[in-house]
């Protein structure tokens, strides 16, 4: 989860989020180098009155500043496209969970089980226990097995919502009448917090998401208890 005054992104807990962090650093370094070069050229132009006559109308220079930006854009686009394809690829999921957005709560259905479904509401501030997080705790957490490929089917019953868990690199729009899908796999156990990331009405800020990633034996015991 995020902390006050945090400068970077949340710690990656899925292969997709690790790729996104690498891409962020890669792109940020390119932007830093370009910005430094531009500032250096501007400072030279402001501090000297000399004119380089050989570059006033040079075909070679024009060729360079046409080809070089194209190479830079390609170096940014290729890793981005690779990650986009990885995010859309779903191979043999071990579990499928359907989540529906409502004003203003989430409902979940484990489609591989006959009768395993529940609603997930935010716990009001006055009912929080010591150590629990304001506006982020829910009455029913989504318990999932770690280190397994899980397919999430996301839709909405009323208006536009967005199901997002930043530390897992997830953000999928919940659109009425349309079923979107995404995949997740956590590399370590723990609680992962998210929120609705699409303004959906007056209580938009009160639609938290809590995923509890556990080892497979614990998940099997939980699913048996819930049914």
From Swiss-Prot:
Keyword field: Copper, Electron transport, Magnesium, Membrane, Metal-binding, Mitochondrion, Mitochondrion inner membrane, Phosphoprotein, Respiratory chain, Translocase, Transmembrane, Transmembrane helix, Transport
Record topology, Mitochondrial intermembrane segments: 1-14, 88-227
Positions annotated to bind Cu cation A2: 196, 198, 200, 204
A single Gene Ontology CC term: mitochondrial inner membrane
Membrane topology: Multi-pass membrane protein
Catalytic function, reaction form: 4 Fe(II)-[cytochrome c] + O2 + 8 H(+)(in) = 4 Fe(III)-[cytochrome c] + 2 H2O + 4 H(+)(out)
Pfam hit, one: COX2_TM
Binding site for Cu cation A1: 161, 196, 200, 207
Disulphide bridges, residue numbers: none
TM segment ranges: 15-45, 60-87
Predominant subcellular localization, coarse grouping: mitochondrion
The protein's enzyme class: translocase
Residues that hold Mg(2+) according to the record: 198
The record's free-text note on cofactor binding: Binds a dinuclear copper A center per subunit.
UniProt-listed InterPro entries: CcO_II, CcO_II-like_C, CcO_II_C, Copper_CuA, Cupredoxin, Cyt_c_oxidase_su2, Cyt_c_oxidase_su2_TM_dom, Cyt_c_oxidase_su2_TM_sf
UniProt cofactor(s): Cu cation
The keyword Nucleotidyltransferase appears for this protein: no
Mitochondrial matrix side: 46-59
EC number: 7.1.1.9
Entry function: Component of the cytochrome c oxidase, the last enzyme in the mitochondrial electron transport chain which drives oxidative phosphorylation. The respiratory chain contains 3 multisubunit complexes succinate dehydrogenase (complex II, CII), ubiquinol-cytochrome c oxidoreductase (cytochrome b-c1 complex, complex III, CIII) and cytochrome c oxidase (complex IV, CIV), that cooperate to transfer electrons derived from NADH and succinate to molecular oxygen, creating an electrochemical gradient over the inner membrane that drives transmembrane transport and the ATP synthase.
Protein name: Cytochrome c oxidase subunit 2
């Amino acid at each position: 989860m995020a902390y006050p005054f945090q400068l970077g992104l949340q710690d990656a807990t899925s292969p997709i989020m690790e790729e996104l962090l690498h891409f962020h650093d890669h792109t940020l370094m390119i932007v830093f180098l370009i910005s430094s070069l531009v500032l250096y050229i501007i400072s030279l132009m402001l501090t000297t009155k000399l004119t380089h006559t050989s570059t006033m109308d040079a075909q070679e220079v024009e060729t360079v500043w046409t080809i070089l930006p194209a190479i830079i854009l390609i170096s940014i686009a290729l890793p981005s496209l690779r990650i986009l394809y990885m995010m859309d690829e779903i191979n043999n999921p071990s579990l499928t969970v359907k989540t529906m957005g409502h004003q203003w709560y989430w409902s979940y259905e484990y489609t591989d089980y006959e009768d395993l479904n529940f609603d997930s509401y935010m716990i009001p501030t006055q009912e929080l226990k010591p150590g629990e997080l304001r506006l982020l705790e829910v009455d029913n957490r989504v318990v999932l097995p770690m280190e397994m490929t899980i397919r999430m089917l996301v839709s909405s019953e009323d208006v536009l919502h967005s199901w997002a868990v930043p530390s897992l690199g997830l953000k999928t729009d919940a659109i009425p009448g349309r079923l979107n899908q995404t995949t997740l796999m956590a590399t370590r156990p723990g609680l992962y917090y998210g929120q609705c990331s699409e303004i959906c009405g007056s209580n938009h800020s009160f639609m938290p998401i809590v995923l509890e990633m556990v080892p497979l034996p614990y998940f099997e015991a939980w699913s048996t208890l819930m049914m």
